[in-house]
Amino acid sequence: PMELLRVTLYYGKANCYRTASAGTLEIDVTPYYSLAGDYTYENRPRVNINGELVDKAVSATVLWRQTNSSSSGDVLSAVPALEGTTLKVPVSGVKGNALVAIRDASGKNVWSFHIWVTEASDLTYINEERGTFKMMDRNLGATSVTPKDQNAYGAWYQWGRKDPFPRPLDIVRSSATTVDNKELTANATTSAEVGTVSYTISNPDTRIFSTNDWHNEWRNNGLWGNSDGLTKNVKTVYDPCPEGYCVPDQNCYQGFTFTSKTECDNNYGHLFVIDGSQTSYFPTGGYLDKGANKIAYQEYRGYQWTSNPGTTGAYYFYYNNANLNFT
């Protein structure tokens, strides 16, 4: 029988671009396609029978931007501009994040890119049972690694989606474990129209409410490159990380040892030992409620997505001031 090919359309070679200094980021926004069944980058240009590029974006716009709480000024120093298949994003050097979309002639968003302004370095995680892993020293979107600094918490993500959601930087720990109506982005409830990958691409700054998975009546376990939860994950065109990085599988978090309630309470997170002596800060940044405009357990609990799908959702690494586990 004839095998049907899966065609995945995308733009550029990564969804996140990080820089620590002022200047102009030049981002490839060539319209590509991939025939890979696992959504990996193949970078095949979309051309017509004459070899001319088709589906090119014609404009760019800033969907949101956020300067970190200890800085002043704008993350972007000027309006991003599209020149052919290059998106030019002027960055001021002020720490923070922005989401820039490229659009077609009708004004529809066809792709988007997370601009992340911060320094960063790599750490080596050594696990005697699971292997050695190279990991960035901070969460995606974080502009600090200092314990108890909200700038260290990073952005929020819905599993399988390529774009971040900004975090309010004025929430302080209180007796309440949930905070209502502080979310900074639009939202919509999943449906046959809304709960699709194509909707998330056109509306990257809209979070989708659901009772379980934002996908409507179906699930796609391979969006972050680990469809069966068993094999080593790969970087997909929906991966939210910078080039050279991808969402980790759960092996990367195995082997951590709970330290103490006092340490977690004092640091709003844990300093987990990653190689026998060196530590990495894991903040208790909380999470966005999947079905409401509600921020839950910020500075009480920490959650880290993995690329591994589960039976009803996806696995995440969970920790608080009492224990740590996978759920």
Question: What is the meaning of each model-derived region?
Answer:
Residues 142, 202, 207, 211-327:
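C-terminal, surface-exposed recognition/capping segments
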Residues 2-235, 310-313:
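Short, compositionally biased
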